[in-house]
Amino acid sequence: MGWLPLLLLLVQCSRALGQRSPLNDFQLFRGTELRNLLHTAVPGPWQEDVADAEECARRCGPLLDCRAFHYNMSSHGCQLLPWTQHSLHTQLYHSSLCHLFQKKDYVRTCIMDNGVSYRGTVARTAGGLPCQAWSRRFPNDHKYTPTPKNGLEENFCRNPDGDPRGPWCYTTNRSVRFQSCGIKTCREAVCVLCNGEDYRGEVDVTESGRECQRWDLQHPHSHPFQPEKFLDKDLKDNYCRNPDGSERPWCYTTDPNVEREFCDLPSCGPNLPPTVKGSKSQRRNKGKALNCFRGKGEDYRGTTNTTSAGVPCQRWDAQSPHQHRFVPEKYACKDLRENFCRNPDGSEAPWCFTSRPGLRMAFCHQIPRCTEELVPEGCYHGSGEQYRGSVSKTRKGVQCQHWSSETPHKPQFTPTSAPQAGLEANFCRNPDGDSHGPWCYTLDPDILFDYCALQRCDDDQPPSILDPPDQVVFEKCGKRVDKSNKLRVVGGHPGNSPWTVSLRNRQGQHFCGGSLVKEQWVLTARQCIWSCHEPLTGYEVWLGTINQNPQPGEANLQRVPVAKAVCGPAGSQLVLLKLERPVILNHHVALICLPPEQYVVPPGTKCEIAGWGESIGTSNNTVLHVASMNVISNQECNTKYRGHIQESEICTQGLVVPVGACEGDYGGPLACYTHDCWVLQGLIIPNRVCARPRWPAIFTRVSVFVDWINKVMQLE
């Protein structure tokens, strides 16, 4: 080999080694501080103005008397620690300023390779014998002298001679000189169940032996799986995980030339150990749903085999028209039978590859969600203002807060402020005349209020919605700058709808639309949101752009995280999303007006829908499209739908050409021009077929639920 190829090889190797982060040797405990309770134990001084946590790790790593460090996120300070959480007299505390990093060798409960680097605190052999202290020569004499470098502390199991069986110790039994401690390798310690989505082991190398890249770093490979966005995926340190529903756990590697690889982990097999039998995967698969789906639909096992746009699904065991990795044999526990809608990768809802070459995959949003509501425990008349029963739990089973209590929520309505409302104990009541029935504040700190486990009495018919009011005045909403009068989604054209938002999942992908009804509130469809109770960490709304995939740094783009979701009244199919901060209103981002309560849009009114959804080949769906539609009466709509259209729904005229809402548009607005303003009269929900010619499109009528919308925005 000549000197030039050798030089190039050395440069390449040095680059590969240079991509390894010193943080790879540490376990991270976010928002945690480690204190030693002894006054005589003093940590190292704070070293301020450190570049980042990697610099702290670089300082701590080679020091034998540094086993952990604090990193102050605010001051970028670093404090080296001579102890870990397993040291005597130490205790972990929550911290709003610090992250704790501890050397893996000191806190791992398993060993890598033969455990020469193991520095844990196991002090008993596999046979149950206590270990002899390394500093003692009785009852068993030996040649080892404890030093800071060899780590022969106390009577902890160690492997100073590289025994292939792993750490061992001399015993306190004269007849048994030494014995293995039986500490499992990290590979053996935890097996993989199903495809390993719930794997939480501590293996940090791939099957080829490459070291894994930390999930919280973006070098050498940038990626979307940021731990703070994927809290449920346990993306700790650089351990093998499966956040995207791959065939088995994997990781990004520290080799710049190899982005990601699978990890070599044992399968649990058919005879599951007791510790695995209660895993999340198996609990999630109990009571598989056939006619509806829960959460994200990972347990859905029904036979729906078309998308919400009516496109037939491709068989999972076929690779045409679309090639894919979800081969049924490799995903045995995902039930990838025939061409049924499934969710093998933890997407937002059940989906499938489609039989249309130009459309790779689509959701099956037409599958209903399983009801989460309790069987009603009583009934009420009218709107329930006179209800004086003793039901004291919400429709989801959450206990009500006492009306006189201020914990966990400070109530607007109390026995003192509303003496005629019967606000006794924590019984469900309706002090504000809510048209959707009795409600209560809840004992859940994250749920301010909800409607109760009650239903309208059978002999009580709800009043019909009112006629349109004579005078309607709107201010500071529903205004836009139209560059063209030709604003005409399927069959639509690129248009301007500054209140239409794009909902983005944790990987930044568009999956639904929504409408900006207040600076910090977005209205969307229940079918788009997988949970109204669990945090939607990592989900965002994007505003101010007509591009589905805007370029980084696009001037008018606003990206705002979703703080929480509030589910609408029963049958509404609505969800309000509260944003972490208010958006900035301008020509590109505007509020849409809400209609008056119970407002009925006159037949013939021209409205428009907007979205980035599937256009079934009629146009380019990478930009926002707007399509015009005329409202028809519910009576006319029911002639097509055989009387199934309710007053809480609104219809638009079916056209000969396919114009309507499709995959990706759901949750977006049906906006009608009323009194010189654009008003949110309807919300796009999944229909039986996408943009079916000559069939009316159905929307949720927003005016029926506008009192709930205003109530949530006021109370929250």
Curated annotation (Swiss-Prot):
The lineage of its organism: Eukaryota, Metazoa, Chordata, Craniata, Vertebrata. One of its GO terms (biological process) is negative regulation of epithelial cell apoptotic process. Residues 489-714 form the Peptidase S1 domain. This is Hepatocyte growth factor-like protein. It is found in: Secreted. PANTHER family: KRINGLE DOMAIN-CONTAINING PROTEIN, PLASMINOGEN-RELATED. SMART domains: KR, PAN_AP, Tryp_SPc. It comes from Mus musculus. Keywords: Disulfide bond, Glycoprotein, Kringle, Repeat, Secreted, Serine protease homolog, Signal. Glycans are attached at N72, N173, N305, N620. The keyword Zinc does not apply. The gene is Mst1. GO terms for molecular function: receptor tyrosine kinase binding; serine-type endopeptidase activity. Residues 19-105 form the PAN domain.
